[in-house]
Each structure stands twice: as C-alpha cells, then as structure tokens.
Amino acid sequence: MKKLMLVSMLLAIMVASAFAAGSQEAAPIAAQAEKVLTQEELIAVAQAEGKVVVYSITSRISGAAAEFEKKYGIKVEASNLKDGELIEKVTREVGGNIQGADFVICQDSGRVYGQLIAPGYLVNYIPPSMVSVIPPEYQNPLNFQLINKVFIFNSEKTQQPVIQNVWEATEPQWKGLIQFKDPKAEGVNANFLTMITSPEWAARLEQAYKARYNKKLVLTTRNAGYEWIKMFFQNGLVLGNSDTKISENIGIKGQPKTTFGLFVYSKTRYDATKNLALLPMTEVVPFSGFIYPAFIMMTQNAKNTHAAKLFIEYLLTAEGFKPWSKDVGSYSSNPTIPINEGDHPVSFWASRLVPEDPQFLFENRAAVEEFVNNITF
C-alpha cells in the first residue's frame, strides 16, 4: 500500500510540474524542426513522407481522412479506438519506442495528462496559422473539439424546463425518473462527478442548496459535491451504457411521467429524426451539465511529422472539421468555424457547464470513483 501511495504521489508531482511549466514545457519539444517551413514547403515535405498515422476516439476521422487524401495525395491510416484503448496503446508504443501513431485525437483529460503528457509521450503542436485564431486557453494542450452533456427532458407534456436547481434532482418527485451514463462506462462522466467535488464547484453547490431550501447544507460527506453525488445516485438514478439509448428512453412519447437525463447535447437532433420529445435545460443552477475537450497532439516518436502537422492544421479548418460540425453539440477550438443553426457558441456554454481540470482530475478521480462504488442504495 505504501509503495502504491508513493507511486501515486510521484505521478501527481510529474503532472503538477507539467502544469507549472505550461506552454514552456510542450513548445520546445514540438519545435524540433530544422527550420520554420512555409506552407508550400510543409506540403511538399509532407507529400514526400507520403502517409500519416492517426489514432482517434471519434470514428468521424475516417471522413476527414478521405478528404485530406483527395486534397493532398497523402495516405491516411486512421484507427478508431476507445479512450482507454488509445491511452494504453500509445503508452505501450511510445514508451517502448515502437512505431505507431504520428498524432492522436484523445479525451479523458486527467488520464491523458497523467499517462501521456507528463511522461512526454505526447507533444503539443500548434499550427502557425492557428496561433492567433485559437483562444489561448485551448492551445496547451491543443484542443481539437469540445463536447457538451446537458440536462435534457421529455418535452411532450411541457416546453418549460422541469428543474431550475440541480438539488431538485435529489428530491422524491424525481425518484427513478433520471438517467445518466454509468461513469464506469465512460471516463468523462467520472470526470464530471470528480469536478463537482472541487472546492469551486462544491462551494457553488452549497450556495445552490441554500438558495433552494433557505437553509445551510448539513454534510454527511467531505463536501457539497460528494453530498450531491450521494443524493443523486440514491434517488433511484438509472444508469445506462449508451447516451443514444438514454436519449431514446427519455425522449420517447407517451410516457406517463416526465423524465430527464444528463447526456450529450448532440442527441437533441433525434427530436426530429426519431420523433422524440427532447429539450435541453440551459439555466439550471449552478450548472446545466458539463463540457469536455478532445485533444489533438503529436506523439514523441512520430515518423511522419510533417504529414501529421499538415493534417492537424487541416482538421482545425472549416473544411477539415466538416464531419463533426454537421451536428449541434460539437465545437471546434477554432471559433471562426460556424456553429449549427439553433446551437449556441462555446462562450455560451462555458458559463453554464462544468469544465475539466486535468490536474485536479488526475489527483482526485480515484477517490471519487471509490466513493461512488461504495454508495448504498
């Protein structure tokens, strides 16, 4: 046990050091080119390399790869992997100096930081054309995409939001009527639960409790974040393994009681395509859901470095992001790429959703997961 605790402490220190260094840590590694190439020179060298290998947590990479191949004549070998599979594969390959991906699109920021960035397996690269375009907060590590999960309700009986405060989700009238993807099935859901135990969000939850009930929250756990998680789960929370299935369960018409869930905002498109009744709630106190990034980074032992840089740049343009931009709830870190009609920009969601803090997640998620596993129903 002591050895395990020592290893955890050392890993946490590594991550903290990477954070303290910020862009100064990643930029020198990413800048190991002989010289800064013009766009024409980059294209020529990339075409000479002839191919690029990418691991991605999103299957839509295949559509972008096909268009990139047509445009530049560079072959793309794209593999679609689950979060954990990608992290383990890159750890094994780069750690063992085995040739694999040239760059990756990855999520689950706490694990990515602790297992891939801190050991130096991933390298931050920002295309020169994007330095003045992408907001600084999305540059290190470079965000490719932002995805949101929002409280969404069955709107057949009412068009008005069914809750205004997250503590309502712990009240008896909603027992057994709320659905959420099992945090064991997806790291970003575990990340959300972890983030609301942070000092900032625990304080906001405590304030929201007082606003709802006009009294101070009496704690039976570490803080208001843990308290909300406990009461949320103990209120008959229905855990699923698919946001698609959850959206169908919530949105199906003809239900005797109104239901709601916390799932990906992009599923609201099913309102029309699957004849469902789904509406988001965007003004819930103190949060209406959460938002998380997918990072795009080069591997430390990338072979086709110029082709990787060219493809990364392409994916950050409106043309390259097209496979993702066709739906609501998918946002490029490049704010010049238009959002879907009826959607809101990232700036709207940023003030309403819980973001990820990779360092806090890396240091605290295990404790929150253990807490959730021990909740008694």
What residue ranges belong to the model's regions?
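A ligand-binding cleft/hinge motif common to bilobed small-molecule-binding domains
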Residues: 110-115, 256-279
